[in-house]
Amino acid sequence: MKAKKTVGSSGSCVRAPALSTEPMAAVKHLAQIPRCTETGMICTQGCVTIEDVTVYFSQEEWKLLDEAQRLLYLDVMLENFTLISSLVYRYEAEAEEKTCAQSLSQTEAPQVRTPKQGQLRQKPHPSDICITVLKDILHLNDLPGQKPYLTEVCTKPQDHKHHRAKNWLKRDVDSLVKSCIFHVAGNPFICSKIGEKFPAIWNLLQPKDIPNGEKQNKIKRGKAFHRDKNNSESDEYKKSSSPQHRLHEYPGVCSAKGGFESNSCEQDLNKYSPAPFRMDQTENRPYECHVCGKWFGQKATLRIHQRRHTGEKPYKCGECGKSFCQSSNLSEHCRVHSGERPFECLECGKAFGCHSSLLRHQRTHTGEWPYECSDCGRLFRQIVSLITHQRTHTTEKPYECGQCEKSFSHKATLTVHQRVHTGEKPYHCEACGKSFSQSANLIKHSKIHTGEKPYECGECGLCFRQRATLMKHQRTHTSERPYECRECGKFFKQYFYLIEHRRIHTTTEFYECEQCGKSYTQKATLIRHQRVHTGESPYKCEECGKAFEYKSRLKRHQRTHTGERPYECAKCGKFFRESYNLAEHQKIHTKAKPYHCDQCGKCFSRRADLVKHQRVHTGERPYTCGECGKTFSRTTNLVQHRRIHTGERPYECDQCGKSFSQVSTLTRHQLLHTGEKPYKCSK
């Protein structure tokens, strides 16, 4: 190793200090060169040149340095070169301004003198000196068969201002690092670890905003990038300056053979590949994020961006308390509560609360499925759906509930689930004030008030509010039972019934009725059943005061007052109050009786009728009167019997006002007023 003697611009000689023969001792000494405490610049007596802070290694010493030592050496040299070059530019700029001022003061009228040929001499650009020295100490010229990946970019007359000259230096050193970093390391290294140990290199690799009209070339995994050695220097420089070849300027950084070895390395290279330095970058985007290095044109935009790193959400919804980092996101969210839908689809007229939802909806008309699963080939309209679907292949459930430790595949499902514990119901119906924990349930509920029933059955013409209800209804025509119990082989029409049935096999605790001994898997089902014995009827009709054991029966009863018959038979046009009455009626047209009694061979159109009929053979009477203990095989018979004890007579004659406990008795009584005699003796 040797120390060179150099001469500064002022003529004073400065010799680099004598260093140890150990290679890394020289690097450590170079990193400890004294600097100014205020500016961080190198402090020396007199004028300092670039070579004054340069340590040279011989070929033998260079080979002794490992990868980390070479990168550390390069990092220290880059920092020193940047500081020295800045001093040179500042010194030359001040000297030139001083010379111009003196010449103007000495003569009243400036005289223009044409220089003779060869008289005009261009000063060597400081970056040329920097590049020459750096190429020398890194032994780039000694590599066999390698052309230096540098061009003479600084041969123009030195008429640049100070800030423009700094930009030239930035571009030259940046180009040098791109071309030689692999030769310095000798082996592949991980991009994400550069910033931890080599800050000067890291500053050159920080992401830059690319000007409009330029796009970075996308790097695909497994593809190698090699420079063509046959190309000339000028062609090579032109290609390297174009945006299409900008990412090729890091040959072998992530792989010794030119290919990527890992996804993380590919992402790091794609993220931190530097773009050429431009003066208008910092002028048009002067505000930089210190966390990720992104630049912004306005300070307010930077503040909004920084909330992603800090997690700050200053905009809070007054209805449900949900917080957002941007006011625009809050405005979109408030439309959930207000029901405002300003974005309308031109195809079908459907409206949406935000523009992104409209764009996703429009794909249903265009048939576009742009996102494909690489594992199974399934297509999706939304990238969120693809990400959620891909977790079915990995069984990944990263979102865990802190209350019950249940895991979910995506965060939205976890948020909805947590409302089970908190009882939160942020979605309110404007018509009736009812609240819901999910927006989908509110949409379904709102159709009750609007009367919208968009899903129509092709067999009978019956319409439904939900598609799932239509699919369940269609099984009444086909008698399809797609849900099978793996334990006993029993089939069910609905998945809900299968889940209820499975508890028979899995549940060890049953809820037994003390009156009749019947067992149930759920306590709520037992409570509903006990109303049969106790006669409790908590649901009361506001019109007539009649009470019912179940809410569903109250709804069906209320149709007797309103006269509503929403279920129409497509064959004969007859209307019915209940869907099951329509289903039974339709079997008259089809004459289908799929349920057979094993005892007598009698056929029935409904399974429930078969169960009731089988009690004739078994003698089973599961329904008992709480007053007298009399038993019945059907609930309707028990209800009619109770009226003997209560004295209830709900069926009144319109002609004479007489009341009856059974509708059949009222029908026979009305024959007295009409004089009708429908029963004729066949003999």
From Swiss-Prot:
Domain of life (superkingdom): Eukaryota
Q: Which GO terms describe its cellular component?
A: nucleus
Can you supply a Gene Ontology BP term from the record?
regulation of proteasomal ubiquitin-dependent protein catabolic process
Q: Does the keyword Metal-binding apply?
A: yes
Q: Where in the cell is it found?
A: Nucleus
The protein's matches in InterPro entries, at most eight in alphabetical order, are given as: KRAB (IPR001909), KRAB_dom_sf (IPR036051), Znf_C2H2-type (IPR050758), Znf_C2H2_sf (IPR036236), Znf_C2H2_type (IPR013087)
Q: Where are the zinc fingers (C2H2-type)?
A: 287-309, 315-337, 343-365, 371-393, 399-421, 427-449, 455-477, 483-505, 511-533, 539-561, 567-589, 595-617, 623-645, 651-673
Annotated KRAB domain ranges read 48-123
**What GO molecular function terms would the record report?**
DNA-binding transcription factor activity, RNA polymerase II-specific; DNA-binding transcription repressor activity; RNA polymerase II cis-regulatory region sequence-specific DNA binding; zinc ion binding
Tell me where it mainly resides. nucleus
The UniProt entry, under SUPFAM superfamilies, shows: beta-beta-alpha zinc fingers (SSF57667), KRAB domain (Kruppel-associated box) (SSF109640)
Q: Keywords of this protein's UniProt record, alphabetized? A: Metal-binding, Nucleus, Repeat, Zinc, Zinc-finger
The UniProt annotation puts the region (Disordered) at: 102-124, 209-247
Biased composition annotated in UniProt, kind: Basic and acidic residues? 225-239
Polar residues composition bias: residue spans: 102-120
Q: List the PANTHER family hit by this protein, alphabetically.
A: RIKEN CDNA 6720489N17 GENE-RELATED, ZNF44 PROTEIN
Protein purpose: Transcriptional repressor. May play a role as regulator of the ubiquitin-proteasome system and autophagy-lysosomal pathway.
| Family, per entry | Belongs to the krueppel C2H2-type zinc-finger protein family.
List the protein's name.
Answer: Zinc finger protein 418
